[in-house]
Amino acid sequence: HSSSDAKNVYVYSYTYDNMERLLSVSLAKDGGNPATLARNTYDEFGHLQNCRLGQSMEGIMQFRYNIRGWTKQIISPHFSQELYYECNFGNSEPCYNGNISAIEWKSKDTTIASTIVSQAYEFFYDGINRLESADYSSSVVPGAETAVGLTLLNERDYSCTYSYDLNGNISSLHRK
């Protein structure tokens, strides 16, 4: 793919393996040498294992899977995410059918060095696997609650509830 304007010409190059999996993304500006933006590696099952980002390739994202091949974790230097299926998380019920029972993500707060903010949703389903509610929670590293801006995080609530009509269409959606 290429795009150009009066001053700049950008050429993106994509490299794939024989199984049509994306191996790398490069960018060349104004006919210069291409710089690698991302490089992917895969495990023996074809799952994305690592994604190295940036020209220095220092920003690495790691992907982990459960025995069924479902994404379980995404880990990077500034962000991590974990999906819960068959495990209890808070009040959520284990889901053995592929539904996600909870998701938790952690990120570094950019305003305060080394402060980790943890946020999560617990999901609840009805008898035919329709999402009934998503309960939000958040927390920060102990001792950081008094930091500017972080106390407000604990006061936010992004929880949702859903209801459906007899045809399975969403009839109401309530956000807090």
Q: Over which residues does each language-model region extend?
A:
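Beta-strand elements of repeat-based all-beta scaffolds
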Residues: 1-176
